[in-house]
UniProtKB/Swiss-Prot annotation:
Superkingdom of origin organism: Bacteria
GO MF annotations in UniProt: ATP binding; protein-exporting ATPase activity
Disulfide cross-links: none
Known EC number: 7.4.2.8
Protein name: Protein translocase subunit SecA
Organism, scientific name: Buchnera aphidicola subsp. Baizongia pistaciae (strain Bp)
Role noted for this protein: Part of the Sec protein translocase complex. Interacts with the SecYEG preprotein conducting channel. Has a central role in coupling the hydrolysis of ATP to the transfer of proteins into and across the cell membrane, serving as an ATP-driven molecular motor driving the stepwise translocation of polypeptide chains across the membrane.
Length: 850
């Protein structure tokens, strides 16, 4: 009842938004004839006029109708493509800081040119964010023609570019790039040692393509820049052997601590927990391997890292599988994105998991890394002044977009009605029966010339289907993490006559599947080989194939398993039925599928048995459909709570990151003449704290504390301050006077040192000392924060709120880090002998770490 009410409420709201936009659409359409009469030069001059009006008080909203009409007319002349009204609607929604749900094939790339042009008029930069380098390069090269025609510049920000080329890309009016590159560039910019080395401008407006993948699917994996630390590969190799002496138990047999087994697996949470028996056995084994001392606890502070390594080894063996979660290529473990099926080159799991998997596979273990800088996509993209996005599937995650990013979701109507036939799910008892039915469906499609796209959830499943098709001599293409380079080409031709394409999850997003094959790809492929006459033959052949595919029923989608998220299922279905084309879809399931096995109710399994489903017989019933939907909703809610919890913890780190980067940027942006004042402030802060630490009374008397203060100043900072002699000589000394005496001595001592060593670039040296020291303590703080986060849940057993405890402890850790870094800066500047060589050493060390 509540779901129906919410659905109706959202539908009414969506309709109201679209209705309100119609006035603007009518205004844009009324300008079309006028703009058609303008020359190319006059159309281009509109950009200059818009910028002038913007600088003189007009708003972007006031310029919207004319700017959209300008882009539409320019597109007609450059591409021969006219923006449909629904694309204008999408452009307006994107400009209004919302998420536009636009079905596959509705022209999201062309739609994005409208808000990109309008917001680029501010000359503050527009970042269009794509999922991979191929899409960024493709869209930039295509749309550059349009934007250059209108007098705007376009940059491409992809992996492998030099800092110089990146800076050029960011200085363009509109920049195309990947989510990873934008995030990593932000982190790298906050690690540089001079302002000129930064590549990004102020983060103004980001428009995210496939926004659901970036802000939801990838939000759990933070961007991390790491540096190598101590090699502990022998420890991982030894701990990998512990798998042979530990055995699991069923979760329902016990709670976390009691049971006959050594550990149990929580598949829902993807975690492994040691039982009390397992803890004892593990400690005994570690003692035998000389990894811990006899009678030592695995939970003691000195062994907590080993504890994490043991759990990582168990997770590596029982929760992470080859050709599902990762592949082994060139003797390296490469992560497979669970949502897209794409490999994630260069990315490594944290918490020792990656090393544990390398040990499991018998590969060379790369040394563990220390985090130098990190940020989640959630917090990175919230740094932009303005954010919007588009995707074919967003409505199921509308609540999360609103709750976390303050983004409303609007469903954009299709240009032509969608006529795809979504057939009901078929559920089999076993996986073997399910795959037999899938193969039979593929055979029938091929026999009637119908193209088929088969979506799988893992490389393993895609290769299983491929092997079955090979035995039947059915030609097909496999698209998974192992064949990433062929992705766009294969998916573009998945609509050809009798084409059978097996794709892992949503590999190939961003490339349209055209019935009969992608004509643009075909023409580009044949352009170098054939004459104009031959090219006409290619077009004629395509038209024949296109019509035959339409008669066969269009692209048929086969889902081999329901994904944890309905949105991913909708993405697969959305590949068919584009722009009013015919098409069909069906999902095949079995009671052995992970979703149903882990999350469905026992009642559903019982009903399947009571019905007495025969071998190779499927069940299709509203009750089953509802049970599957309930299972998916359970997982979606769990994943949302997980992402929400991750964000709550990361928000604490994010606030500290914001303060730290602000202070760091103050140092970088300060003129050399101001660095001296910053040094004085640091000296003042540190030495006042030192005086307050030793001296409590207002009027000084001879005491042990005064001698300790003198010793501290002498030993740690080379400052000789004879306070005790003054007191012995009966000179009255107050605490306030003492602070002034100490600071005066400090300033004199430091000035003498500068004069003595005649350092040419003293201010640059000071700047580098401050930055290098701050960065060192920040790295150590990040490691401490991670250890705190990993163990904070244990506070719950003491009736304390782990989140509040994390906030409280991390706050004091941060203050201590800032205080310790200032103390170290002062110690280096006062105690260390300095020369021009020291300047070079610190500079080179900083560059090496970076």
């Amino acid at each position: 009842m509540i779901q129906k009410f919410l659905k109706k409420l959202f539908s009414d709201r969506n309709d109201r938004i679209l209705q309100n936009i119609q006035t603007v659409i009518s205004k844009i359409n009324s300008m079309e004839k006028f703009f058609e009469k303008l020359s190319d030069l006059e159309l281009k001059r509109n950009t200059t006029r818009f910028c002038y009006r913007l600088n003189n008080g007009e708003t972007l909203d006031q310029l919207l109708p004319e700017s959209f009409a300008t882009v539409r007319e320019a597109s007609k002349r450059v591409f021969g493509m006219r923006h449909f009204d629904v694309q204008l609607i999408g452009g307006i929604i994107l400009h209004q800081r919302c998420i536009a749900e636009m079905r596959t094939g509705e022209g999201k790339t062309l739609t994005a040119t409208l808000p990109a042009y309008l917001n680029a008029l501010q000359r503050k930069g527009v970042h269009i964010v794509t999922m991979n380098d191929y899409l960024a390069k493709r869209d930039a090269e295509k749309n550059r023609l349009l934007f250059n025609f209108l007098g705007l510049t376009v940059g491409i920000n992809i992996s492998g570019l030099s800092s110089k080329l990146k800076k050029q890309a960011y200085n363009a009016d509109i920049t195309y790039g990947t989510n990873n590159e934008y995030g990593f560039d932000y982190l790298r910019d906050n690690m540089v040692f001079c302002r000129e080395d930064k590549v990004q401008r102020e983060l103004n407006y980001a428009l995210l393509d496939e926004v659901d993948s970036i802000l939801i699917d990838e939000s759990r994996t933070p961007l991390v820049i790491s540096g190598s630390i101590e090699d502990v590969s022998d420890v991982y190799i030894k701990i990998n052997e512990i798998i042979q002496v530990l055995f699991s138990q069923k979760q329902e047999d016990s709670d976390v601590f009691v049971g006959n087994g050594h550990f149990y697996i929580d598949e829902k949470q993807r975690q492994v927990f040691l039982t009390e028996r397992g803890l004892v056995r593990t400690e005994e084994w570690l003692v035998s391997q000389n990894l811990i001392d006899k009678k030592e606890s695995l939970y003691s502070s000195k062994n907590i890292v080993l504890m994490h390594n043991v759990v990582a080894a168990l997770r590596a063996h029982y929760l992470f599988f080859k050709n599902v979660d990762y592949i082994v290529k060139n003797k390296k473990v490469i992560i497979v994105d669970e949502h897209t099926g794409r490999t994630m080159e260069g990315r490594r799991w944290s918490d020792g998991l990656h090393q544990a998997i390398e040990a499991k596979e018998g590969l060379k273990i790369r040394s563990e890394n220390q985090t130098l800088a990190s940020i989640t996509f959630q917090n990175y993209f919230r740094l932009y002044k303005k954010l919007s996005g588009m995707t074919g599937t967003a409505i199921t995650e509308a609540f999360e977009f609103r709750a976390i990013y303050n983004l409303d979701t609007v469903v954009i109507p299709t240009n032509t009605p969608m006529i795809r036939d979504d057939k009901p799910d078929l559920v089999y008892m076993t996986e073997l029966e399910k795959f037999d039915a899938i193969i039979e469906d593929i055979k029938q499609c091929v026999s009637r010339n119908q193209p088929v796209l088969v979506g799988t959830i893992s490389i393993q499943k895609s290769e299983l289907i491929s092997q079955k098709l090979l035995k039947l001599n059915i030609k097909h293409n496999v698209l998974n993490a192992k064949f990433h380079a062929q992705e766009a080409k294969i998916i573009a031709q998945a609509g050809k006559l009798r084409a059978v394409t097996i794709a892992t999850n949503m590999a190939g997003r961003g490339t349209d599947i055209v019935l009969g094959g992608n004509l643009e790809f075909l023409l580009a492929h044949n352009n170098e080989k054939h004459t104009d006459e031959k090219m006409e033959d290619v077009i004629k052949k395509w038209n024949i194939e296109h019509n035959l595919v339409l008669k066969s029923g269009g692209l048929h989608i086969i889902g081999t398993e329901r994904h944890e998220s309905r949105r991913i299922d909708n993405q697969l279905r959305g590949r068919s039925g584009r722009q009013g084309d015919c098409g069909s879809s069906r999902f095949y399931l079995s009671m052995e599928d992970s979703l149903l096995r882990i999350f469905s109710s026992e009642r559903m399994i019982s009903i399947m048995r009571v019905i007495g489903v025969k071998k190779n017989e499927a069940i299709s019933h509203p009750f089953v459909t509802k049970a599957i939907l309930n299972a998916q909703q359970k997982v979606e809610y769990r994943n949302f709570e997980f992402r929400k919890q991750l964000l709550e913890y990361d928000n604490v780190s994010n606030e500290q990151r914001r303060v730290f980067y602000y202070q760091r940027n103050q140092i970088i942006n300060s003129k050399d003449s101001n660095i001296g004042d910053i040094i004085k402030n640091i000296f003042c802060d540190v030495f006042l704290k030192i005086v307050n630490k030793f001296i409590k009374q207002k009027l000084l008397k001879q005491s042990q504390k005064i001698l300790e203060l003198e010793s501290c100043l002498r030993d740690n900072f080379n400052i000789v301050c004879s306070i005790s002699k003054k007191i012995r000589d009966n000179i009255v000394v107050y605490k306030s006077d003492l602070s002034k005496i100490v600071l005066k001595k400090v300033y004199q001592s430091y000035q003498c040192k500068i004069n003595k060593y005649i350092l040419k670039d003293v201010r640059k040296y000071e700047r580098l000392v401050i930055l290098d020291t701050l960065d060192y303590f920040w790295r150590e703080h990040l490691a401490s924060m991670e250890y705190l986060r990993q163990g904070i849940h244990l506070r719950g057993y003491g009736q304390k709120d782990p989140k509040q405890e994390f906030k409280r402890e991390s706050f004091f850790m941060f203050l201590n880090m800032l205080s310790s870094s200032r103390y170290e800066i002062v110690s280096i500047l006062l105690k260390k002998s300095i020369s021009n060589n020291d300047f070079l050493k610190i500079y080179n060390h900083a560059k090496l770490v970076f």
